[in-house]
Amino acid sequence: MPVTTPTKMATLTTKQMWQTIKDYFGDGFVTGSAPISYNVHTCDMQLQPDSGIHAASDGIHYGVQISEDSMPLFSIMGDTAAPPCTCHRVDEIVKHIDEFLERAPEALPDDGAITSGKPCDTNPDQVSLYAMRDSLSWWVHWGGNLRPEHYWKQIYIGFAAIPDDVQISPREFLDGTYRYLGHTWDDCLSGLEEEGVSPDEIEFANMCMWRQMLTQWLEKADPELLPLLKGKISLMLQYRVLTANTLGCLALFMNATADPKDGPIHYADSSYEMEIASVAQCVTLDMAKEAMGILQGERTEVVAGDRAQRKRELRWIYVRCMQILESQPHAHMLRRYGSAGLHYVPMMDRYLERVSGHTRFPIRDGAARILERFINRAELPKESEDINPNGRSLKVSAKMNGNGQLHHEVNGNAKLHLEAERPDVTTAVG
Protein backbone atom coordinates (compact mmCIF):
# COMPACT_ATOMS: atom_id res chain seq x y z
CA MET A 1 0.00 0.00 0.00
CA PRO A 2 1.45 3.43 -0.88
CA VAL A 3 2.34 5.82 1.89
CA THR A 4 -0.73 7.99 2.48
CA THR A 5 0.29 10.32 5.29
CA PRO A 6 -1.33 13.78 5.34
CA THR A 7 2.10 15.34 4.74
CA LYS A 8 2.12 13.95 1.21
CA MET A 9 -0.87 16.04 0.13
CA ALA A 10 0.07 17.70 -3.14
CA THR A 11 -2.32 20.62 -2.65
CA LEU A 12 -0.33 22.34 0.09
CA THR A 13 1.09 25.79 -0.57
CA THR A 14 4.74 26.56 0.13
CA LYS A 15 3.69 28.41 3.27
CA GLN A 16 1.65 25.40 4.41
CA MET A 17 4.61 23.09 3.74
CA TRP A 18 6.74 25.33 5.95
CA GLN A 19 4.14 25.21 8.71
CA THR A 20 3.91 21.42 8.39
CA ILE A 21 7.62 20.93 9.03
CA LYS A 22 7.51 23.45 11.88
CA ASP A 23 4.80 21.34 13.51
CA TYR A 24 6.61 18.07 12.77
CA PHE A 25 10.08 18.98 14.07
CA GLY A 26 9.09 21.40 16.81
CA ASP A 27 11.56 23.58 18.65
CA GLY A 28 15.04 22.42 19.55
CA PHE A 29 17.10 23.88 22.39
CA VAL A 30 16.14 27.37 21.18
CA THR A 31 12.54 28.47 21.65
CA GLY A 32 11.02 29.51 18.34
CA SER A 33 13.60 27.62 16.28
CA ALA A 34 11.25 25.19 14.50
CA PRO A 35 11.92 23.89 11.90
CA ILE A 36 15.62 24.90 12.10
CA SER A 37 15.66 22.92 15.30
CA TYR A 38 18.50 21.04 16.98
CA ASN A 39 18.61 19.08 20.20
CA VAL A 40 22.43 19.21 20.27
CA HIS A 41 24.10 22.54 20.99
CA THR A 42 27.47 22.27 19.23
CA CYS A 43 28.87 25.35 20.97
CA ASP A 44 28.57 23.55 24.32
CA MET A 45 30.36 20.37 23.28
CA GLN A 46 33.18 19.51 25.67
CA LEU A 47 36.43 17.81 24.70
CA GLN A 48 37.40 15.04 27.09
CA PRO A 49 41.07 14.66 28.06
CA ASP A 50 42.86 12.09 25.90
CA SER A 51 44.46 9.45 28.11
CA GLY A 52 46.05 7.76 25.12
CA ILE A 53 44.18 4.58 26.00
CA HIS A 54 41.15 3.69 23.87
CA ALA A 55 40.58 0.11 24.99
CA ALA A 56 37.24 1.07 26.50
CA SER A 57 35.81 1.97 23.11
CA ASP A 58 36.30 0.50 19.68
CA GLY A 59 34.80 3.67 18.19
CA ILE A 60 38.22 5.28 17.76
CA HIS A 61 38.99 2.79 15.00
CA TYR A 62 36.26 4.12 12.69
CA GLY A 63 36.34 7.21 10.54
CA VAL A 64 39.06 9.82 10.10
CA GLN A 65 40.02 11.62 13.28
CA ILE A 66 42.77 14.22 13.45
CA SER A 67 43.34 15.24 17.03
CA GLU A 68 43.44 18.87 18.09
CA ASP A 69 47.09 18.73 19.13
CA SER A 70 48.20 17.18 15.82
CA MET A 71 46.45 19.66 13.51
CA PRO A 72 49.47 22.01 13.25
CA LEU A 73 51.26 19.23 11.34
CA PHE A 74 49.00 19.98 8.37
CA SER A 75 49.50 23.23 6.50
CA ILE A 76 45.82 23.27 5.56
CA MET A 77 44.79 23.12 9.22
CA GLY A 78 46.26 24.78 12.29
CA ASP A 79 44.94 25.64 15.72
CA THR A 80 41.33 25.70 16.92
CA ALA A 81 39.09 28.21 18.67
CA ALA A 82 35.66 27.98 20.23
CA PRO A 83 33.04 29.74 18.09
CA PRO A 84 31.10 32.66 19.52
CA CYS A 85 27.61 31.28 19.97
CA THR A 86 25.07 32.75 17.57
CA CYS A 87 22.74 29.73 17.78
CA HIS A 88 20.15 31.59 19.82
CA ARG A 89 19.52 33.97 16.93
CA VAL A 90 17.94 31.19 14.89
CA ASP A 91 14.49 32.39 15.96
CA GLU A 92 15.23 35.63 14.08
CA ILE A 93 15.92 33.60 10.94
CA VAL A 94 12.67 31.68 11.33
CA LYS A 95 10.74 34.93 11.81
CA HIS A 96 12.37 36.39 8.69
CA ILE A 97 11.37 33.32 6.65
CA ASP A 98 7.82 33.46 8.02
CA GLU A 99 7.54 37.05 6.83
CA PHE A 100 9.07 36.26 3.44
CA LEU A 101 6.59 33.44 2.83
CA GLU A 102 3.69 35.76 3.64
CA ARG A 103 4.52 37.84 0.56
CA ALA A 104 6.33 35.38 -1.71
CA PRO A 105 4.49 34.06 -4.80
CA GLU A 106 4.09 30.32 -5.28
CA ALA A 107 6.12 30.39 -8.48
CA LEU A 108 9.24 32.41 -9.20
CA PRO A 109 10.77 33.19 -12.62
CA ASP A 110 14.00 31.39 -11.65
CA ASP A 111 12.30 28.16 -10.57
CA GLY A 112 13.85 25.41 -12.67
CA ALA A 113 17.03 27.40 -13.31
CA ILE A 114 20.36 25.59 -13.13
CA THR A 115 22.41 26.81 -10.15
CA SER A 116 25.37 24.41 -10.32
CA GLY A 117 27.81 27.18 -11.21
CA LYS A 118 29.12 25.13 -14.14
CA PRO A 119 28.59 27.07 -17.38
CA CYS A 120 28.44 23.92 -19.50
CA ASP A 121 25.27 22.78 -17.69
CA THR A 122 22.25 23.51 -19.89
CA ASN A 123 19.83 20.61 -19.34
CA PRO A 124 18.38 20.01 -15.84
CA ASP A 125 18.03 16.28 -16.47
CA GLN A 126 21.67 16.02 -17.48
CA VAL A 127 22.52 17.88 -14.27
CA SER A 128 20.39 15.32 -12.42
CA LEU A 129 22.40 12.52 -14.00
CA TYR A 130 25.59 14.04 -12.62
CA ALA A 131 23.85 14.43 -9.25
CA MET A 132 23.04 10.70 -9.34
CA ARG A 133 26.69 9.95 -10.03
CA ASP A 134 27.57 12.06 -7.01
CA SER A 135 24.89 10.46 -4.83
CA LEU A 136 26.16 6.95 -5.47
CA SER A 137 29.72 8.14 -4.84
CA TRP A 138 28.71 9.56 -1.46
CA TRP A 139 26.84 6.36 -0.64
CA VAL A 140 29.86 4.11 -1.15
CA HIS A 141 32.17 6.48 0.73
CA TRP A 142 29.77 6.38 3.67
CA GLY A 143 30.16 2.61 3.64
CA GLY A 144 27.18 1.50 1.55
CA ASN A 145 26.96 -0.72 -1.50
CA LEU A 146 25.07 -0.67 -4.78
CA ARG A 147 22.89 -3.68 -4.15
CA PRO A 148 19.45 -3.40 -5.79
CA GLU A 149 17.49 -3.58 -2.54
CA HIS A 150 18.70 -0.05 -1.78
CA TYR A 151 17.63 1.44 -5.13
CA TRP A 152 15.06 3.87 -3.72
CA LYS A 153 17.28 4.88 -0.82
CA GLN A 154 19.84 5.90 -3.42
CA ILE A 155 17.18 7.74 -5.43
CA TYR A 156 16.42 9.58 -2.16
CA ILE A 157 20.06 10.70 -2.02
CA GLY A 158 19.65 11.89 -5.61
CA PHE A 159 16.65 14.01 -4.62
CA ALA A 160 18.80 15.40 -1.80
CA ALA A 161 21.63 16.27 -4.21
CA ILE A 162 19.70 18.05 -6.93
CA PRO A 163 18.37 21.21 -5.17
CA ASP A 164 21.96 22.38 -4.80
CA ASP A 165 22.29 22.42 -8.59
CA VAL A 166 18.76 23.32 -9.75
CA GLN A 167 16.32 25.78 -8.16
CA ILE A 168 13.32 23.57 -7.49
CA SER A 169 9.93 24.93 -6.53
CA PRO A 170 8.81 23.18 -3.31
CA ARG A 171 5.27 22.98 -4.67
CA GLU A 172 6.39 21.33 -7.91
CA PHE A 173 8.54 18.89 -5.94
CA LEU A 174 5.52 17.97 -3.82
CA ASP A 175 2.82 17.76 -6.50
CA GLY A 176 4.91 15.68 -8.91
CA THR A 177 5.39 18.36 -11.56
CA TYR A 178 9.10 18.08 -10.86
CA ARG A 179 10.64 14.70 -11.67
CA TYR A 180 14.14 13.58 -10.80
CA LEU A 181 15.38 11.50 -13.75
CA GLY A 182 11.72 10.72 -14.45
CA HIS A 183 10.80 9.84 -10.85
CA THR A 184 8.31 11.80 -8.76
CA TRP A 185 8.73 12.24 -5.01
CA ASP A 186 5.71 9.99 -4.46
CA ASP A 187 7.47 7.30 -6.52
CA CYS A 188 10.41 7.50 -4.13
CA LEU A 189 8.26 7.29 -1.00
CA SER A 190 6.37 4.28 -2.34
CA GLY A 191 9.66 2.67 -3.33
CA LEU A 192 11.04 3.10 0.18
CA GLU A 193 7.97 1.31 1.50
CA GLU A 194 8.56 -1.55 -0.96
CA GLU A 195 12.11 -1.81 0.36
CA GLY A 196 10.77 -2.44 3.85
CA VAL A 197 11.48 0.95 5.41
CA SER A 198 9.03 1.47 8.29
CA PRO A 199 6.30 4.13 8.07
CA ASP A 200 7.90 6.17 10.87
CA GLU A 201 11.28 6.12 9.14
CA ILE A 202 9.71 7.08 5.82
CA GLU A 203 7.86 9.96 7.39
CA PHE A 204 11.04 11.20 9.06
CA ALA A 205 12.99 11.00 5.79
CA ASN A 206 10.05 12.68 4.02
CA MET A 207 9.97 15.61 6.43
CA CYS A 208 13.75 15.99 6.26
CA MET A 209 13.45 16.22 2.48
CA TRP A 210 10.66 18.80 2.70
CA ARG A 211 12.86 20.83 5.02
CA GLN A 212 15.78 20.57 2.62
CA MET A 213 13.74 21.54 -0.43
CA LEU A 214 12.33 24.55 1.40
CA THR A 215 15.63 25.79 2.85
CA GLN A 216 17.43 25.29 -0.48
CA TRP A 217 14.71 27.21 -2.33
CA LEU A 218 14.63 29.96 0.29
CA GLU A 219 18.38 30.61 0.12
CA LYS A 220 18.00 31.19 -3.64
CA ALA A 221 14.62 32.94 -3.65
CA ASP A 222 15.15 35.38 -0.78
CA PRO A 223 18.16 37.66 -1.37
CA GLU A 224 17.99 38.95 2.21
CA LEU A 225 18.34 35.56 3.91
CA LEU A 226 22.00 34.58 3.49
CA PRO A 227 23.38 37.97 4.63
CA LEU A 228 21.66 37.30 7.97
CA LEU A 229 23.61 34.04 8.30
CA LYS A 230 27.05 34.79 6.90
CA GLY A 231 29.88 35.48 9.31
CA LYS A 232 28.07 33.67 12.13
CA ILE A 233 29.50 30.17 11.95
CA SER A 234 27.23 28.35 14.41
CA LEU A 235 24.11 29.96 12.96
CA MET A 236 25.15 29.35 9.35
CA LEU A 237 26.11 25.76 10.19
CA GLN A 238 22.63 25.07 11.56
CA TYR A 239 21.06 26.25 8.31
CA ARG A 240 23.69 24.71 6.06
CA VAL A 241 23.26 21.22 7.55
CA LEU A 242 19.54 21.34 6.74
CA THR A 243 20.18 22.38 3.14
CA ALA A 244 22.44 19.32 2.77
CA ASN A 245 19.90 16.99 4.45
CA THR A 246 22.68 14.89 5.94
CA LEU A 247 20.25 13.85 8.67
CA GLY A 248 17.58 12.38 6.36
CA CYS A 249 20.25 10.68 4.25
CA LEU A 250 21.83 9.26 7.40
CA ALA A 251 18.52 7.79 8.55
CA LEU A 252 18.17 5.78 5.33
CA PHE A 253 21.86 4.89 5.21
CA MET A 254 21.60 3.43 8.72
CA ASN A 255 18.49 1.52 7.67
CA ALA A 256 20.50 -0.01 4.82
CA THR A 257 23.65 -0.87 6.73
CA ALA A 258 22.57 -1.70 10.29
CA ASP A 259 22.88 -5.30 11.45
CA PRO A 260 19.40 -6.85 11.03
CA LYS A 261 19.70 -8.69 14.34
CA ASP A 262 19.87 -5.32 16.12
CA GLY A 263 16.55 -4.22 14.65
CA PRO A 264 15.76 -0.87 13.01
CA ILE A 265 17.43 2.33 14.19
CA HIS A 266 14.95 5.15 14.83
CA TYR A 267 15.78 8.83 15.08
CA ALA A 268 13.66 9.12 18.23
CA ASP A 269 16.04 6.72 19.99
CA SER A 270 19.30 7.94 18.42
CA SER A 271 18.75 11.65 17.81
CA TYR A 272 21.81 12.78 19.77
CA GLU A 273 24.38 10.75 17.88
CA MET A 274 22.63 11.16 14.53
CA GLU A 275 22.51 14.95 14.82
CA ILE A 276 26.20 15.11 15.69
CA ALA A 277 27.12 12.85 12.75
CA SER A 278 25.03 14.92 10.34
CA VAL A 279 26.76 18.11 11.50
CA ALA A 280 30.18 16.43 11.38
CA GLN A 281 29.77 15.39 7.76
CA CYS A 282 29.05 18.96 6.68
CA VAL A 283 32.02 20.18 8.72
CA THR A 284 34.45 17.67 7.19
CA LEU A 285 33.04 18.36 3.73
CA ASP A 286 33.75 22.06 4.17
CA MET A 287 37.20 21.43 5.67
CA ALA A 288 38.14 19.33 2.64
CA LYS A 289 36.67 21.81 0.16
CA GLU A 290 38.65 24.60 1.79
CA ALA A 291 41.82 22.49 1.53
CA MET A 292 41.18 22.11 -2.21
CA GLY A 293 40.43 25.81 -2.67
CA ILE A 294 36.77 25.46 -3.67
CA LEU A 295 34.85 26.56 -0.55
CA GLN A 296 35.26 30.32 -0.79
CA GLY A 297 32.31 32.05 -2.43
CA GLU A 298 29.74 29.28 -1.93
CA ARG A 299 26.26 30.46 -1.03
CA THR A 300 26.35 28.85 2.42
CA GLU A 301 30.07 29.25 3.07
CA VAL A 302 30.39 28.69 6.82
CA VAL A 303 33.78 30.42 7.09
CA ALA A 304 32.76 33.62 5.30
CA GLY A 305 34.00 36.83 6.91
CA ASP A 306 37.14 36.48 9.01
CA ARG A 307 38.04 33.24 7.24
CA ALA A 308 41.13 32.40 9.30
CA GLN A 309 39.17 32.67 12.55
CA ARG A 310 36.09 30.90 11.18
CA LYS A 311 38.28 27.98 10.06
CA ARG A 312 39.69 27.66 13.59
CA GLU A 313 36.12 27.47 14.84
CA LEU A 314 35.15 24.88 12.22
CA ARG A 315 38.04 22.64 13.29
CA TRP A 316 37.01 23.07 16.93
CA ILE A 317 33.56 21.68 16.09
CA TYR A 318 35.01 18.79 14.06
CA VAL A 319 37.29 17.58 16.87
CA ARG A 320 34.47 17.54 19.40
CA CYS A 321 31.96 15.87 17.11
CA MET A 322 34.38 13.05 16.37
CA GLN A 323 35.31 12.47 19.99
CA ILE A 324 31.68 12.39 21.10
CA LEU A 325 30.80 9.93 18.33
CA GLU A 326 33.62 7.64 19.51
CA SER A 327 31.55 6.57 22.51
CA GLN A 328 28.12 6.38 20.86
CA PRO A 329 26.24 3.09 20.32
CA HIS A 330 26.54 3.30 16.52
CA ALA A 331 30.08 4.68 16.34
CA HIS A 332 31.03 2.09 13.72
CA MET A 333 28.63 3.74 11.26
CA LEU A 334 28.48 7.32 12.46
CA ARG A 335 32.18 8.15 12.72
CA ARG A 336 32.75 7.04 9.14
CA TYR A 337 29.67 8.95 8.00
CA GLY A 338 30.65 12.05 9.96
CA SER A 339 34.24 12.18 8.71
CA ALA A 340 33.53 11.04 5.13
CA GLY A 341 34.01 14.51 3.67
CA LEU A 342 37.74 14.25 4.33
CA HIS A 343 38.09 11.37 1.88
CA TYR A 344 35.30 11.78 -0.67
CA VAL A 345 36.04 15.40 -1.60
CA PRO A 346 39.52 14.72 -3.05
CA MET A 347 38.23 11.61 -4.87
CA MET A 348 34.85 12.55 -6.31
CA ASP A 349 34.34 14.02 -9.76
CA ARG A 350 31.83 16.49 -8.28
CA TYR A 351 34.62 18.37 -6.50
CA LEU A 352 37.43 17.68 -8.97
CA GLU A 353 35.25 19.34 -11.63
CA ARG A 354 35.22 22.49 -9.50
CA VAL A 355 38.99 22.36 -9.06
CA SER A 356 39.28 22.06 -12.85
CA GLY A 357 37.48 25.33 -13.50
CA HIS A 358 33.84 24.35 -12.89
CA THR A 359 33.69 22.07 -15.91
CA ARG A 360 32.15 18.62 -16.34
CA PHE A 361 34.02 15.35 -16.78
CA PRO A 362 32.58 12.90 -19.34
CA ILE A 363 30.60 10.03 -17.86
CA ARG A 364 32.61 6.95 -18.76
CA ASP A 365 31.04 3.73 -20.04
CA GLY A 366 31.29 1.93 -16.71
CA ALA A 367 29.59 4.78 -14.86
CA ALA A 368 26.99 5.13 -17.63
CA ARG A 369 25.97 1.50 -17.19
CA ILE A 370 25.52 1.98 -13.45
CA LEU A 371 23.58 5.24 -13.88
CA GLU A 372 21.25 4.03 -16.65
CA ARG A 373 19.09 1.96 -14.33
CA PHE A 374 18.32 5.04 -12.22
CA ILE A 375 16.64 6.78 -15.19
CA ASN A 376 12.89 6.37 -15.73
CA ARG A 377 13.07 7.04 -19.47
CA ALA A 378 9.32 6.66 -19.98
CA GLU A 379 8.81 9.93 -18.08
CA LEU A 380 11.69 12.00 -19.42
CA PRO A 381 10.77 15.06 -21.49
CA LYS A 382 11.62 14.86 -25.18
CA GLU A 383 14.52 17.26 -24.87
CA SER A 384 16.17 14.91 -22.36
CA GLU A 385 15.84 11.65 -24.27
CA ASP A 386 19.51 11.73 -25.25
CA ILE A 387 21.01 11.98 -21.77
CA ASN A 388 23.45 9.22 -20.82
CA PRO A 389 23.93 8.00 -24.41
CA ASN A 390 26.60 5.48 -23.41
CA GLY A 391 24.19 3.86 -20.98
CA ARG A 392 21.20 4.03 -23.30
CA SER A 393 23.11 2.31 -26.10
CA LEU A 394 23.22 -0.86 -24.02
CA LYS A 395 19.46 -1.19 -24.58
CA VAL A 396 18.99 -2.24 -20.97
CA SER A 397 15.72 -1.21 -19.36
CA ALA A 398 15.31 -1.26 -15.61
CA LYS A 399 12.23 -2.86 -14.11
CA MET A 400 11.15 -3.19 -10.51
CA ASN A 401 9.68 -6.24 -8.86
CA GLY A 402 7.36 -6.16 -5.87
CA ASN A 403 10.26 -5.92 -3.44
CA GLY A 404 11.76 -2.86 -5.06
CA GLN A 405 14.56 -4.95 -6.56
CA LEU A 406 15.84 -4.29 -10.02
CA HIS A 407 15.58 -6.73 -12.88
CA HIS A 408 16.91 -6.01 -16.33
CA GLU A 409 15.35 -6.83 -19.63
CA VAL A 410 18.08 -6.96 -22.25
CA ASN A 411 16.95 -6.35 -25.85
CA GLY A 412 13.47 -7.55 -24.94
CA ASN A 413 14.68 -11.01 -23.95
CA ALA A 414 15.64 -12.75 -20.72
CA LYS A 415 15.13 -10.96 -17.41
CA LEU A 416 18.20 -11.06 -15.22
CA HIS A 417 18.78 -10.20 -11.60
CA LEU A 418 21.14 -7.28 -11.30
CA GLU A 419 23.43 -9.40 -9.14
CA ALA A 420 23.76 -11.99 -11.89
CA GLU A 421 24.27 -9.46 -14.66
CA ARG A 422 26.60 -7.01 -12.96
CA PRO A 423 28.33 -8.75 -10.04
CA ASP A 424 31.05 -6.13 -9.93
CA VAL A 425 28.68 -3.43 -8.65
CA THR A 426 27.29 -5.46 -5.76
CA THR A 427 30.50 -5.51 -3.77
CA ALA A 428 30.16 -3.83 -0.40
CA VAL A 429 32.53 -0.97 0.29
CA GLY A 430 33.79 -0.95 3.85
Swiss-Prot record:
It comes from the Eukaryota. GO terms for molecular function: alpha-humulene synthase activity. Its cofactor is Mg(2+). Induction: Expression is significantly up-regulated under xenovulene A producing condition. Its EC number is 4.2.3.104. It is an enzyme of class 4 (lyase). Keywords: Lyase, Magnesium. Pathway: Secondary metabolite biosynthesis; terpenoid biosynthesis. The keyword Lyase applies. It catalyses: (2E,6E)-farnesyl diphosphate = alpha-humulene + diphosphate. Alpha-humulene synthase; part of the gene cluster that mediates the biosynthesis of xenovulene A, an unusual meroterpenoid that has potent inhibitory effects on the human gamma-aminobutyrate A (GABAA) benzodiazepine receptor. The first step of xenovulene A biosynthesis is the biosynthesis of 3-methylorcinaldehyde performed by the non-reducing polyketide synthase aspks1. The salicylate hydroxylase asL1 then catalyzes the oxidative dearomatization of 3-methylorcinaldehyde to yield a dearomatized hydroxycyclohexadione. This is Alpha-humulene synthase asR6.
